[in-house]
Amino acid sequence: MIDLSSLFGELDIYLFDQLLRGRIAGGMTVFDAGCGHGRNLVFFLREAYPVYAIDPDPDAIRSVRSLAQRLAPLLPASNFRAEAIEACSFPDHSADVVVSSAVLHFARDEAHFRAMLEGTWRLVKPRGLFFCRLASSIGMEHRFASLGGRRFALPDGSERFLVDEPYLLAFTSELDGELLDPLKTTVVQDRRCMTTWVLRKGA
């Protein structure tokens, strides 16, 4: 029997959906912008995708380098760097697929959100895929306590920068991106909302 957890790791289910729909194919360069300890990278490393990743936490990058050494030993350690997204040293148009999973909602304010988003978007190749999952207020608009601006206290005890549909659609237009799927939001039992935002970059 196939060990699915060994094959896919803890791959985000909505990112898995992009794989199933053929939008992420073998040989595409994958960049995880805010990779943590690599939960979304196991499959791509195991299947020999060209993989790059950044995270501001040096411990997380050490973990990802160790994971890559085990699953894809031919990838250089320099593919994985301890850097903030808004100060990323990788060049523009680095990847066919750029993943931003549970990252942008850690923005301090709107200026920081914009810097993080623009730092991520520039990495996407023309006609490339941008996959983003982030906290939002969609579906629970009246359940969050404002901390000023777009920062809110959530019922689960966390504090997040929250987007909404008009905010994401405005950025979609500003970035000249093509919305590949309608915005999809999961409400987690009156605790928080997570929205999936998938764009195709223009030529």
Model features per residue range: what roles?
Residues 1-25, 30-31, 36-87, 130-203:
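Class I (Rossmann-like) S-adenosyl-L-methionine-dependent methyltransferase catalytic domain
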Residues 58, 110-114:
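Non-membrane alpha-helical structural segments and their capping/turn regions in soluble enzymes
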Residues 97-111:
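A short SAM/SAH-binding and catalytic strip from SAM-dependent methyltransferases
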Residues 86-98:
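A short acidic, Gly/Pro-enriched loop at the edge of an enzyme's catalytic core
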Residues 114-126:
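A short glycine-rich, Lys/Arg-flanked "PGG" loop and its adjoining helix->strand segment in the class I
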Residues 104, 116, 136:
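Flexible, active-site-proximal loop/turn residues at the rims of small-molecule/cofactor binding pockets
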